[in-house]
């Protein structure tokens, strides 16, 4: 890798791969870069909000199934718009899926990470670069408020709760009127 590709690789590792590894408990918070520690805050907040809204159960048994279903889900998420909030949802979703694979001991978490990495590289990174890159993502993370988080969680749930990939989406909070 050289030049521009190395820069892109570093951006994806900072934003996506670092958080997934932290989420799976493969690295500690102290091993995160200062930048990763900052974005971890908003991603953890997104995850907490999502966790309060719905329980997502995965059914993943093969690398091909992960690639196909992951791509279907995230393509649906971004089919009409890319924004920083949806990118946060994408990262949290990727981390949850990887952790599920690790916890299920099916040794497929690396497939999730590779699939998420490739999707971000080919589908999201050009938008991210043209919208300020890491600096703008961090600015979004630091200035995101509860309303934008809830809005993006609602959107995330509306896209995924009826998707065949998810076996169940239960425990919606009645007072949030999510979908």
Curated annotation (Swiss-Prot):
Function: Suppresses apoptosis in host cell to promote the viral replication. Has the ability to potentially bind to all the members of the proapoptotic Bcl-2 family. Inhibits autophagy by interacting with host Beclin 1 (BECN1).
InterPro entries assigned: Bcl-2-like_sf (IPR036834), Bcl-2_BH1-3 (IPR046371), Bcl-2_fam (IPR026298), Bcl2-like (IPR002475), Bcl2_BH1_motif_CS (IPR020717), Bcl2_BH2_motif_CS (IPR020726)
Stated name of the protein: Apoptosis regulator Bcl-2 homolog
Motif (BH1): 76-95
Keywords associated with the record: Early protein, Host endoplasmic reticulum, Host mitochondrion, Host-virus interaction, Inhibition of host apoptosis by viral BCL2-like protein, Inhibition of host autophagy by virus, Late protein, Modulation of host cell apoptosis by virus
GO cellular component, one term: host cell endoplasmic reticulum
Subunit structure and binding partners: Interacts with host BECN1 (via BH3 homology domain); this interaction allows the virus to inhibit BECN1, and thus autophagy. Interacts with host BID. Interacts with host BAX.
UniProt motif BH2: location: 126-141
PROSITE patterns per the UniProt record, alphabetical: BCL2_FAMILY (PS50062), BH1 (PS01080), BH2 (PS01258)
Cellular compartments annotated: Host mitochondrion; Host endoplasmic reticulum
Gene Ontology terms, MF aspect: BH domain binding
Induction data: Expressed in the early phase of the viral replicative cycle. Expressed in the late phase of the viral replicative cycle.
Source superkingdom: Viruses
Gene Ontology biological-process annotations: regulation of apoptotic process; symbiont-mediated suppression of host apoptosis; symbiont-mediated suppression of host autophagy
Keyword set includes Transferase: no
Family indicated by similarity: Belongs to the Bcl-2 family.
């Amino acid at each position: 890798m050289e030049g521009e590709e190395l820069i892109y690789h570093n951006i994806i590792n900072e934003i996506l791969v670092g958080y997934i590894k932290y989420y799976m408990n493969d690295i500690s918070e102290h091993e995160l870069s200062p930048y990763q520690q900052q974005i971890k805050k908003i991603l953890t907040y997104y995850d907490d909000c999502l966790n309060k809204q719905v329980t997502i159960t995965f059914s993943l048994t093969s690398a091909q199934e992960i690639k196909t279903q992951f791509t279907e889900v995230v393509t649906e998420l971004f089919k009409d718009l890319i924004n920083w909030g949806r990118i946060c949802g994408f990262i949290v979703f990727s981390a949850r899926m990887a952790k599920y694979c690790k916890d299920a001991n099916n040794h497929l978490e690396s497939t999730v990470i590779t699939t998420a990495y490739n999707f971000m590289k080919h589908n999201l990174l050009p938008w991210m670069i043209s919208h300020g890159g890491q600096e703008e993502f961090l600015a979004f993370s630091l200035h995101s408020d509860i309303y934008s988080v809830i809005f993006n969680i609602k959107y995330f749930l509306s896209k995924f709760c009826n998707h065949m990939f998810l076996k169940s989406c239960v425990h919606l909070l009645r007072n949030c009127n999510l979908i």
